[in-house]
Regions:
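Terminal RNA-binding accessory module
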Residues: 103-201
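Conserved non-cysteine loop/helix-boundary elements of the Radical SAM core domain that shape
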Residues: 1-86, 95-112
Length: 201
């Protein structure tokens, strides 16, 4: 709680946090030597969102971990649907030589792992679109990173890590340089990108 309150009150701290949860099933988390549980994860996320209503939470999940049953995966899907993370990536479990997980029973077929990965990503795609559509009409501060081939500017908000999160495509009537901060009105939204125009001073 002390750390959450520090984040909420510090003006120079972005309300963005990356928590690599990887799964929500209690048994799987225990086998991964994680101290967290489904209930504790939900409690932490709830406290973060209560303290910072605008917080954007990024996480990563692993689909097809050894021993993951159909029921376990269904729980993971329901968890992602309930939590509605602003940013989420998912990867199929990769068997790495020399790791404990590589020797565990219940290895999931590669095709099944990829199918489960695709299902979570399809779900997250709709969640991301929902979050982005809610931003249409808002004015957001954007960090300019460059220009597209058609002359549109490319940037990101304080809620987007470079290379992995959303981008903002926007127009401006003036010349901008990478590193500039501008106010952009969001006029359209896609799954993983926002479209806008600079607010004239």
């Amino acid at each position: 709680d002390e750390l959450i309150q520090a984040m909420a009150s510090a003006p120079k701290v972005c309300h963005y946090i990356d928590i690599p949860l990887q799964h929500c099933n209690d048994r799987i988390l225990k086998e991964m030597n994680r101290c967290s549980t489904d209930a504790s994860i939900k409690d932490t996320i709830g406290r973060l969102r209560k303290a910072m209503p605008d917080i954007h939470i990024r996480t990563t999940m692993i689909a097809g971990l050894p021993g993951e049953t159909k029921e376990d995966f269904a729980q993971l899907e329901a968890f992602v649907e309930e939590m509605k993370f602003e940013r989420l990536g998912v990867f199929p479990y990769s068997k790495e030589e020399g790791t404990l997980a590589a020797t565990m029973k219940g290895q999931v077929r590669q095709q099944t792992k990829e199918k489960r990965r695709d299902a979570i990503m399809a779900l997250q795609c709709s969640i991301s679109l929902e979050h982005n559509q809610a931003k249409v009409g808002q004015v957001m501060e954007v960090l300019v990173e460059g220009q597209d081939e058609d002359g549109s500017y490319i940037g990101r908000t304080r809620y987007d890590a470079p290379d992995v999160d959303n981008g903002v495509l926007f127009t401006s009537s003036r010349q901008l340089e990478p590193g500039d901060f501008v106010e952009v009105e969001i006029i359209d939204a896609f799954d993983y990108d926002l479209v806008g125009r600079e607010v004239e001073a």
